[in-house]
Swiss-Prot record:
GO biological process per UniProt: DNA repair; DNA replication; negative regulation of DNA-templated transcription; proteolysis; SOS response
Keyword set, alphabetical order: Autocatalytic cleavage, DNA damage, DNA repair, DNA replication, DNA-binding, Hydrolase, Repressor, SOS response, Transcription, Transcription regulation
EC top class named in words: hydrolase
Site (Cleavage): 90-91
Full protein name: LexA repressor
Repressor recorded as keyword: yes
Residue ranges of DNA binding: 29-49
Record-stated family: Belongs to the peptidase S24 family.
Active-site annotation: 126, 163
Species per Swiss-Prot/TrEMBL record: Clostridium novyi (strain NT)
Pfam families for this protein: LexA_DNA_bind, Peptidase_S24
Amino acid sequence: MSRSSEDKQIEIYEFIKEQIIEKGYPPSVREICKGVGLSSTSSVHGHLSKLEKKGLIRRDSTKPRTIEILKEPIVPKEMVNIPILGKVTAGTPILAVENIEDTFPISLNFIPSNKDLFMLKISGESMIDAGILDGDLAIIEKTNTAKNGEIVVALIDNEVTLKRFFKEDKHIRLQPENKNMDPIILEDDSVSIVGKLAGIFRRY
């Protein structure tokens, strides 16, 4: 093995450790590419395979972001597993999946402390002008109240939707953040707030 190849493996190994310590979870292959200055994901896969053969890391090929450091203990910053409850349509509401699909580990540094949180998958484009895109994971703080202008998860006839909330004279207005879409106007007693937006996670 050339010295440059071995040096690159050391650099990748150290980058993975730093990311786990900083974020609490390992980087993706593309993030490793960017972090160590490689343009080819296949090169990164090759280096990871060699690190795995050396017993320095362990991977699960069936799951993303499952690189585990084996040779030395890494203590990530305090973490919490947020349940992913299903899919919320940012457009036409669809029936929400109430059971937990998965959990997502995230450092407490990146979320509000002492809050009851869950995540929902975004599908649709009604919130694109607020920077919320199809495929995003929305981090939601559980609450049944909201102030005007806050982005909320609203329950309508056992369906959920993500919109900006406005309580007006005789109704509730759920406003999309897409100039091509109309607001949803509802009677006060026909909509319930189940949470408000605390953050967005996006995979690139």
